[in-house]
Amino acid sequence: MSKLICVAKIGAAHGVRGEVRLWTFTEDPLAVLHYGPLTTKDGSRSFEVAKAREAKDHLVATIKGVTDRNAAERLNGLELYVPRDRLPETDDDEYYHADLIGLAAETTAGAPLGRVLAIHNFGAGDIIEIAPPSGSTLMLPFTNAVVPTVDLAGGRVIIELPAEIEGEDQDSSDNAGSPEGDAAASNSARHPRESGDP
């Protein structure tokens, strides 16, 4: 069975005719119209987005079978999922967040660092967050220089630790993940595609 990927979250009702605010986690917000039925995480409920239009930072959507405000309000907060195999294939150096989360992280020397916890973008580029077995998480630029290898088949990413981090003890690693400095500016960025964090 294909892994489920969260592609949208239903927000508050919009108007009195059953429309809802819909936050999507896809590169193209309107792509949710083309994925077919979307389900809850447990698969117990299925929804189809009949139509949608873009608003400020979300969509205003009509869900098939939802015809009044009361029905729309009952859906508030629901996350909507699609099987991974329904999503488009990625290009080289392009990855879905869900495919990266959980991968083992190790240094170029083969030392284990932990697991990929999340991919963030705070406006200055993509950041990979790695959770070590203990201690604070590492936040590193998700660039070709810092993450030279993404091995989805092998279930791992290889990390070239920036010079300012290498050799630091765990107590000083709180600021180690700062995307500033040479590592953030070096080489080209990778391109994780949002599809939900899961």
Curated annotation (Swiss-Prot):
Bias kind Acidic residues: ranges: 163-172
Family assignment from sequence similarity: Belongs to the RimM family.
GO terms for MF: ribosome binding
Residue intervals of the PRC barrel domain: 92-168
Transmembrane listed as a keyword: no
Function: An accessory protein needed during the final step in the assembly of 30S ribosomal subunit, possibly for assembly of the head region. Essential for efficient processing of 16S rRNA. May be needed both before and after RbfA during the maturation of 16S rRNA. It has affinity for free ribosomal 30S subunits but not for 70S ribosomes.
Keywords: Chaperone, Cytoplasm, Ribosome biogenesis, rRNA processing
GO biological process: ribosomal small subunit biogenesis; rRNA processing
Organism in which the protein naturally occurs: Bradyrhizobium sp. (strain BTAi1 / ATCC BAA-1182)
Protein's recorded name: Ribosome maturation factor RimM
Notes concerning its domains: The PRC barrel domain binds ribosomal protein uS19.
HAMAP family according to UniProt: Ribosome_mat_RimM
UniProt keyword rRNA processing, yes or no: yes
CC annotations in GO: cytoplasm; ribosome
InterPro entries assigned: PRC_barrel-like_sf (IPR011033), PRC_RimM (IPR056792), RimM (IPR011961), RimM_N (IPR002676), RimM_N_sf (IPR036976), Transl_B-barrel_sf (IPR009000)
Main location (coarse class): cytoplasm
Region (Disordered): 163-198
